[in-house]
Amino acid sequence: KSYNVGTVLFEDKASETKGSDIYHRIIPDAESYIKEQARTVLATLYNSPEDSITPVNKIHYTLEDIEGISAKGGGNGDVTIFYSTRHIEKSFAENDTAKLFFETRGVLLHELTHAYQLEPQGIGSYGTNRVFWAFIEGMADAVRVANGGFDGPNARPKGGNYMDGYRTAGYFFVWLRDNKDPEFL
């Protein structure tokens, strides 16, 4: 049995941009690609489709001509994720298709993790508690690390601690999985 990823709706809100054109060249079937990466995320976070999985009914994924990289919004089963065509253009500055594909997959793994991950309970929220924030962002980057979404050990920040969130926490969480508890993620 496979994981239920929900319905994926892809919408290009920046079709006139160079970033949109580049995206469509590297990802010709966005909805299928997003579903494939969602299954990767689910298989990383959960042991089986029978686990108690955060339900996602719909993912509305958009390309947008805005600043930033990507972000997940929504909730209660209806998720939105945007990906910036400006970031796509910057990532493609050297005309390196493989590098851009690698970055696009890594960003998608991170944002999809936010859609399906469990959240800490009883300690506040993303905006009010640093531990909550560090866990949420660290776990999203841990899924990216665990699935080869960064350039290996060289991408691991030196120093810092897990409360730094993102990549620092992500590499630490994967280390915990590999060295202390195979069920950590």
Cite the ranges covered by each PLM segment.
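Surface-exposed patches in mature extracellular/periplasmic domains of secreted proteins
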Residues: 42-62, 123-131, 152-158, 183-185
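Auxiliary, metal-adjacent structural segments of Zn-dependent hydrolase domains
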Residues: 24-86
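Post-HExxH zinc-binding segment in Zn-dependent metallohydrolases
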Residues: 37, 127-170
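Short pre-active-site segment immediately N-terminal to the catalytic Zn-binding motif
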Residues: 87-108, 123-132
